[in-house]
Amino acid sequence: MGAKSMRSWCLCQICSCGSDYCPYEIVKQPRHVPEEYKPKQGKIDLGTTYKRDLNSYKVQPVAIVRPLERQVKKGKLDTVPTYKDDYRAWDLHKSELYKPEQTYHPPTVKFGNSTTFQDDFVPQEIKPRQSFKPSSVVKRSTAPFNGITSHRLDYIPHQLELKFERPKEVYKPTDQRFEDLTTHRCDFQGLIGETAKLCRPVHTRVTQNALFEGSTEFRESFQPWEIPPPEVKKVPEYVPPTGSMLLNSTSHLDYVPYQANHVVPIRPVSQKRSNNFPFQGKSIMKEDFPAWESCRQGLIKKQQQIPNPSGKFDGLSTFRSHYVPHELIPTESCKPLNIAFKSSVPFDDVTMYSVEYTPKRQEICPASYPSPPGYIFDNTNSQGHKFFRKIIPAVKAF
């Protein structure tokens, strides 16, 4: 009990309204080390359910259902449908009206312009009710305005310390090698393997005073060789032939002429028409597909079992023949009379809320006081948090 009473409490722990909040230090979360990837052993099964469950079938060509020979019927085509033959129009007669003739007689009395609502409504005097709403008039106080706030009362001015001016540091480049490590390189490190061997030849630095050789690998591998001069062929002197030139060719000497006949054309000779009658216009289509000799089809309608009525149509229905008119009796109105209810008893303005409401005591946050009741100021830490200590009640000695 003594150790608990000696403990100091921060102002944010004493506060009950949550206005005084002290930030706490952020604890860094532990870093998750990823596990090393280990590839699975064995081969991948590339089989699928489609390859396993598929059963192939032999596909055969579809047999032709269309008949080989075409049957052409002769006769004229009947374009009259069965609807027009079976359902013919009836001779309709206009039915007489059964509504009684009523001649309108205008009223002789002058129209009063009064409705049933105006006749039944009794005007009543409206009495204004007593208003329980508080008045909106602002009451000005005569006392002077007290502009002292809790901030002005509790504020303690402190003397500002002189700012420490840090001297400007001269930049000195480091001798150590720059480590360009990132979070990705730290977290995802590669597997340890053998270092790659350089295939690049050793770079020999050329001194400035040495002359540039200008030799390449191609020049060293393919060196020039001596080409012997071409041999000059001696051209013999031109000796012209003796005698005259023969202009006969092998075609002139070996050619034998033949007597060939003209080709007879296969196309028939066009003969001009000597007749004067008009063009018939016959074609293979018209000769193969002549007009059908069609006959009118008989009625497919069944014979009527019920005989048709004879005589004039009465137009009476079962409702009209059995209907008996009755006199209308007006229903009695059960609506209460619209008369204001007057009572001499005063109005009882007591509600369930005013009866059952229990006012609660408004608690004041202890942190709003300059020194919370029941606590003694202890100290202030480096972050500016105030700490208080509970007052131990005095125990009377017997």
Curated annotation (Swiss-Prot):
Region described as Mn 5: spans on this chain: 316-328
UniProt region (Mn 6), positions on chain: 350-364
Region: Mn 2, residue numbers: 148-162
GO cellular component assignments: axonemal microtubule; centriole; ciliary basal body; cytoskeleton; sperm flagellum
Region: Mn 4, residue numbers: 282-296
One Pfam match: SAXO1-2
Entry GO MF terms: microtubule binding
Region annotated Mn 3, chain positions: 248-260
Recorded family membership: Belongs to the FAM154 family.
Protein name, entry field: Stabilizer of axonemal microtubules 2
Gene this chain is encoded by: SAXO2
